[in-house]
Curated annotation (Swiss-Prot):
Transmembrane segments: none annotated. Pfam families: gp32. This is Single-stranded DNA-binding protein. Residues 273-302 are annotated as: Disordered. GO terms for molecular function: metal ion binding; single-stranded DNA binding. Belongs to the Tequatrovirus single-stranded DNA-binding protein family. Keywords: DNA damage, DNA repair, DNA replication, DNA-binding, Metal-binding, Repressor, Viral DNA replication, Zinc. HAMAP family: SSB_T4. Zn(2+) binds at H65, C78, C88, C91. Coiled coil: none annotated. Residues 280-290 have a biased composition (Low complexity). The acidic C-terminus is involved in modulating the ssDNA binding properties. The N-terminus LAST motif is involved in the cooperative binding of the protein to ssDNA.
Amino acid sequence: MFKRKSTAELAAQMAKLAGNKGGFSSEDKGEWKLKLDNAGNGQAVIRFLPSKNDEQAPFAILVNHGFKKNGKWYIENCSSTHGDYDSCPVCQYISKNDLYNTDNKEYGLVKRKTSYWANILVVKDPAAPENEGKVFKYRFGKKIWDKINAMIAVDVEMGETPVDVTCPWEGANFVLKVKQVSGFSNYDESKFLNQSAIPNIDDESFQKELFEQMVDLSEMTSKDKFKSFEELSTKFSQVMGTAAMGGAAATAAKKADKVADDLDAFNVDDFNTKTEDDFMSSSSGSSSSADDTDLDDLLNDL
């Protein structure tokens, strides 16, 4: 059941999580999402809940890569969730090609994406009142994550008091406000309210009811949820095509593709109607030398 925990313990758990940035999990019915109106605005009151396991943090961090290229999708969990950047073909592709510094567009497409997960109690949901009083998984971004951290990482010397927002007795409700700003969802007005206990939390039967609705978030990041490097590499190559080779190999492959396209476009009928004089005149000049140079370059690249 629920136990009181120190804010220092929560701070240590969150710091450990932050070191292993983690983002993909498929859609499931246990996830709560704020319903927005036609203008893209919405609000609700939620309560972040503690972990089901006292030894684990009340949050989970997932990293994924999700993008579409050459008409194909790549959506997979990234091993950097566990601090392992070598077992992800996309991370290797980014690193080997130094995409962050050399190709901002490509980097923006394939970069790691981080999502944060928590168990929450829905306190007030005006757009879907049937959710009130129920426990769900909730996925959120860095803006809200920073607001949670700000409640813990306070300046004690200045008289500020750290708050474990997940504590059922001394935590705080969170007012989630989303507004559409320049085409994007903005969470700036979201905030924690004053510390308060969850109503009826001292009732053991109520505690049990909440506890049984919660999920073990550690299962979301367990290594059996991540595919092998070989399997991911195959998928990545299928999506990326020759670009997955990187460097000179990719350039050479593009040249080879162009040669193949040129051969496909060759008109045999035109060839059959050319006279001996046509061939003699077309062979003069520097075109033959240029073609030989291109071919040499292609072979060298390969």
